[in-house]
Amino acid sequence: MYDYPLYRPPSESNSLIIQATLGCSHNKCSFCNMYKSKIFTIKSLEEIKKEIDYFRTIYKYVEKIFLADGDALIIPIGDLKSILEYIKNVFPECTRVTMYGSPKSILLKSIEELEELKKLGLYMIYMGIESGDDEVLLDINKGVSSKELIKATQKVKKSKITLSVTVIAGIGGKEKSINHAINTGKIISEIEPDYLGVLTLMLEKGTDLYNKILNKEFNVLNDKDILDEIKLLIENIDVSNHVIFRCNHASNYISLKGTFPIDKQRLLNEILYYQNTNNLKQEVFRRL
């Protein structure tokens, strides 16, 4: 039924995955090889409905559904509405549907269209921001500027869909670490997402970034540099509304969690503890 590899956010570990698309609509980020083996494809509405029907026959109760692969929001609005309506009919007990959404796929949809998706059960959009620094965004071939990232996230917020964003520590290398941390903190402050996750750069063979490292065109941060960068990122986050923060992904050297703004100082104190004790995850245990 599934076309592997298959990815989903850690928080969707108990969700039924319906693979409405294959691959990623952008698939050009220099650091990512998740979908390099796939040609991006949007499945037909008929095929998606058949898969939904199939899962109904094997699962008696499904509370959460995640639409895969890497950018299900790119599906044309009419088909996406039909998918959500069909899920409601086949899985009436389902309380939330979530998906990845690229900045460009969000920008292609109006606030009114996003509001319609919200009414039909779309609870959360996961979006990779990676960085708030325009030079870094250009370097990693993200395909959007920081202004476009802000515009996309504001549309999600206005539609009342829950927004979960991720950024990547170390993605700017040593040369751009400071600007990456400061400007990423600033963009998070402006966006005020519902959830913020920090991952740490993993070196994936076959990616453009990996080749840059081999050619000594990119200097990788060590574990202590990463802590300094995350600390600087947190120092530059200034929000009024609650932002649930997680830095506990398997790629990270340390585990942090809290809620901005109330836990900001505690998080900084915890980083200081890690810096003083050097009690960091060993490289061999880091993974995506």
Map each language-model feature to its residues.
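Conserved strand-turn element in the central/C-terminal portion of the radical SAM core barrel
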Residues: 104, 132-136, 156-180, 199-205, ...
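Canonical Radical SAM [4Fe-4S] cluster-binding loop centered on the CxxxCxxC motif
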Residues: 4-47
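Aromatic/hydrophobic pocket-lining residues that form the small-molecule binding cavity
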Residues: 48, 80, 110, 149, ...
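Conserved, mostly hydrophobic/aromatic
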Residues: 24, 32, 48, 67, ...
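Auxiliary Fe-S-binding modules of radical SAM enzymes
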Residues: 2-12, 186-288
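Hydrophobic faces of well-ordered beta-strands that scaffold small-molecule active sites
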Residues: 16-18, 63-65, 95-101, 125-127, ...
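Conserved SAM/AdoMet-binding glycine-rich loop
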Residues: 56-159
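Catalytic cores of alpha/beta
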Residues: 112-114, 172-190
